[in-house]
A protein has these predicted regions:
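N-terminal leader/targeting and accessory segments in enzymes
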Residues: 1-95, 99, 241-246, 268
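Gly/Ser/Thr-rich beta-alpha loop segments that engage phosphate groups in nucleotides
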Residues: 15-20, 37, 116, 143-144, ...
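Short aromatic/hydrophobic contact patches that present stacked aromatics
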Residues: 69-71, 109-111, 264
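Pocket-edge structural micro-motifs
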Residues: 13, 56, 114, 162-163, ...
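Adenine nucleotide phosphate-binding catalytic loops in nucleotide-utilizing enzymes
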Residues: 4-8, 12, 47, 191-198, ...
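Phosphate-binding loop of NTP-binding sites
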Residues: 25-31, 48, 61-63, 74-216, ...
């Protein structure tokens, strides 16, 4: 499927954080965006202000419009009238993750994966890239404080995305660089066992080709076997180690690999240093930080 010929698009569950980021992308492209959600919210209000036409009634009235594509979130109820209608329609119907995969297919994709920290690390990477002169785009799983949005529009071919393991959504992506923060026992309702979770992550990591790069936390070192290059970050071992840590009530400072350069972070706690280290590791690996 190609997105170049789309003039109108319907989002089922448009108020969700991931769906609304996609909607903002298409609005910025000048495409007519329509949406359904169960209830109004700050996000649907913001999308309406941008030009989206949104309904909160799950009935046939919405189907009076003709759409080139319908995108839905897996969170849509199975008995939704609109979801069932478009499942039986000839109009292309795809999941949110599939739409994200199509959008980023021909970009240099930095995919942030892991059980924790994806939104924070993705936001930090996008901010770092922008500050270093790379006008990236980003699809975030939360509203970034620095950008006041969950979608960041850029002019370069670099895009930062969250690679969500839920429902194996990350398998739709074509990553060039992957950040892996952690692998924990989450989503057992989908995967059943930790072994299945690890297997799914490894399948995603192996979507990297021979020149792809994986940057991962030292905590998951025993579970990683992939093609391409690897860089490790953490506190004890690896290519990028946080050293000289100082944690204060309102901020933290640290260096990398015992260098004289000191990084100041406006948050305290080792986990925030770890997130910042992941983002800086991307910059160092790309030769921009």
């Amino acid at each position: 499927m190609h997105l170049n010929n789309i003039n109108s698009i319907l989002f089922l569950g448009i108020g969700g954080i991931g769906m609304s980021a996609l909607a903002k992308y298409f609005i910025a492209k000048g495409i007519n965006v329509y949406g359904y959600d169960k209830t109004p919210s700050e996000m649907t209000d913001a999308l309406t202000d941008l030009g989206a036409k949104i309904t909160f009634i799950d009935d046939a009235k919405c189907t009076e419009n003709v759409f080139d594509l319908v995108v839905y979130t897996p969170a849509m109820p199975k008995d939704s009238f609109l979801l069932n209608y478009y499942q039986q329609s000839t109009i292309p119907l795809i999941k949110r993750s599939q739409a994200l995969g199509l959008i980023t297919k021909n970009s240099f994709t930095i995919a942030v994966s892991g059980s924790h920290g994806k939104t924070t690390v993705s936001s930090m990477i996008a901010f770092l890239l922008k500050e270093c002169g790379i006008d990236c785009s980003a699809f975030l799983g939360g509203v970034s404080v620095n950008f006041n949005s969950n979608y960041i529009q850029g002019k370069s071919d670099v895009v930062v995305v969250e690679a969500d393991e839920f429902d194996r959504s990350f398998m739709t992506l074509s990553p060039n660089l992957i950040v892996l923060t952690s692998i924990d026992t989450d989503h057992l309702d989908i995967y059943g066992t930790r072994e299945n979770i690890v297997t799914s992550f490894l399948e995603f990591l192996n979507k990297l080709d021979d020149i792809g790069i994986l940057i991962h936390n030292e905590k998951v070192i025993d579970e990683i076997l992939i093609r391409g290059k690897k860089r490790i970050y953490g506190f004890q071992i690896g290519d990028y180690k946080a050293t000289s840590l100082k944690i204060y009530p309102t901020h933290s400072t640290f260096s990398i690999n015992d260098s004289e350069e000191v990084f100041k972070l406006n948050y305290n706690g080792r986990h925030n240093i770890e997130n910042a280290l992941a983002a800086i590791s991307v910059g160092l690996t790309m030769g921009i930080a």
